Amino acid sequence: MVLDNLGSSLRGSLDKLQGKSRLDEDDVEEIVKEIQRSLLSADVEVSLVMELSSSIEDRATGEEPPAGTSARDHVLRIVYEELVDLVGDSTDLPLKSQTILLAGLQGSGKTTSAAKMAWWFSTKGLRPAVIQTDTFRPGAYDQAEQMCERAEVSFYGDPDCDDPVKIAREGIEATADADIHIVDTAGRHALEADLIDEIEAIDSTVAPDRSLLVLDAAIGQGAKQQAREFNNAIGIDGVVVTKLDGTAKGGGALTAVNETDSSIAFLGTGETVQDVERFEPNGFISRLLGMGDLKQLSERVERAMAETQEADDDWDPEDIMEGSFTLKDMRKQMEAMDRMGPLDQVMDMIPGLGGGLKDQLPDDAMDVTQNRMRDFDVIMDSMTEAELEDPRSVGASRVRRIARGSGTDEETVRELLQQHKMMERTIKQFQGMGEGDMQRMMKKMQQQGGGGMGGLGGGGGLGPFG
């Protein structure tokens, strides 16, 4: 994930300040050097790195910590505020009728991003349409059509036409009933003159309200030239950063934002059309520093529960809070969790679980956990309806039968039953809570996630410092 190494190394440096009430010059120097090393290794431009580190150093040595605030929390607040300022605000994309033009080199992820953005707008109650104008890349039309089918959004393209400007013009007309028009353009392997000429012609034809540059998170220092060329041609209003689910450094996105004086609009976090986030600087930096992002978490939970319920009309998640908790309910919870995205991303959003705790886990911990969930699903396939409804009926002989039938071992079957008991106990605790109890519990979670900071608000999109 973008700047992930920065988050890990910063948390390590900040943890060394635990118990200190005041900072000395050596403390500040170590933190500033760590920031410089991490940002430079993430391909952030040198001038940006020096500007940020200088600002943090000046504030850390010149500002007095508020009464009752530890040295660690004082520096954490400064680093948080300066990093939010570095990444900038999110691109202004009002939820109303507009045309969005996508630009970028071949392989940057434009076509996938077009479908993902269209899906995102559709979840906000709008009617988006994707217009595919790429006549250069073989398979571009088919890929766009398939992605839009998965996103369940309107699509226009013409595989028999080799004039991208004509396709763009006719696409706008053919999808006139759409609220949002997302125009996907061709890319090249390099910034060639014909690419710039083509996108300038499309820009003149569709007159976009917003032009977004799509960048692969692995782009590195090459982002600066790309951003400058496209900005000179059509004017870039924002950046879409793709492929953040891998090991990409991501610093090139910050360089592009600085070069175009724009901002980040969306983050692509996975391969499916739902793996997209509207960029929220406060929540993003909060996650980076291990303080969670409850706003993004709640959006993912709500979406995952709705999709799970839609797939099974007979299941209602609210029933869990009123009746018994069966293995069927546990299975639905697992399905919803799977729909929330990769487990490591979800952990980053939970105050107290992301950040430092995740850093201590083995590298393969998330994969092992998700594989175990798949094992549990296979085991439940080998259980009878009565066993799924009443796990207490599963004795030793049934455990052996289920293990043989599922191709797993008895230990894993018992682990599933034990996991169910733990979840059942947790559900019962929630069942006895009123709304006020729930809010107090969430507030406590947020405070724990921020290292005990008295001023922690933890609102996700508003940032952890209110």
Curated annotation (Swiss-Prot):
Residue ranges with Gly residues bias: 448-466
Binding site for GTP: 104-111, 184-188, 242-245
Organism expressing this protein natively: Haloquadratum walsbyi (strain DSM 16790 / HBSQ001)
The protein's Enzyme Commission number: 3.6.5.4
Subunit structure: Part of the signal recognition particle protein translocation system, which is composed of SRP and FtsY. Archaeal SRP consists of a 7S RNA molecule of 300 nucleotides and two protein subunits: SRP54 and SRP19.
Subcellular location, record wording: Cytoplasm
Reaction equations catalysed: GTP + H2O = GDP + phosphate + H(+)
Name of this chain's protein: Signal recognition particle 54 kDa protein
Pfam families in UniProt: SRP54, SRP54_N, SRP_SPB
Free-text function comment from the UniProt entry: Involved in targeting and insertion of nascent membrane proteins into the cytoplasmic membrane. Binds to the hydrophobic signal sequence of the ribosome-nascent chain (RNC) as it emerges from the ribosomes. The SRP-RNC complex is then targeted to the cytoplasmic membrane where it interacts with the SRP receptor FtsY.
Molecular function in Gene Ontology: 7S RNA binding; ATP hydrolysis activity; GTP binding; GTPase activity
GO BP term, example: SRP-dependent cotranslational protein targeting to membrane
Gene that encodes it: srp54
The entry's keywords: Cytoplasm, GTP-binding, Hydrolase, Nucleotide-binding, Ribonucleoprotein, RNA-binding, Signal recognition particle
